[in-house]
Amino acid sequence: MSSSQDKQSKWDSVKRYKLNKMISKLGNITGHGTELVTVYIPPRRPIYDIVSQLKNEAGTASNIKSDLTRNHVQDALSRTVEHLKLYKEPPENGLVIFCGAIPTGKGIGTEKIEIYSVVPPKAVQINLYRCDDHFWIDHLKDMMKDDKVIGILSLDTQEAGFGILTGDRWE
């Protein structure tokens, strides 16, 4: 069994179910403004780089005109920085953090800052920071897709072509 298959076997059906449920929950959350922070951290990216970037973004967030949105973004960023202090380095597959002011009732002012941290089933390939009215879950959804390898062979009387299809990627 190869090492990638061994790593994948660690993600049993219960973990996969819980992560799919969390992705579904996060996908249904929308903020009142650009109050929801998404951070994807690759496995070899130093945590202090991400902390520095987020502190810089917190300074930039002070320019947001709406008091409520500014406070929510700054609170989410500071909560994310505090959460990252729990790690000396990213986990083996990287880390994905979702944090923001999530509405608990109807109307503005009912939001509560919540944070969700995920160690994905596959290595995070991108370094991403987004502050938006929704969480950026597409990359995490892609990691959850089945990635069986399919070989495709096309024969003609004069030529032949071979390709490999892995998930939704063609080589």
How would you name each of these model-derived features?
Residues 146-170:
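Gly/Thr-rich phosphate-binding beta-strand-loop-beta motif of the actin/hexokinase/Hsp70
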Residues 1-143, 149:
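Non-catalytic, solvent-exposed interaction/assembly segments
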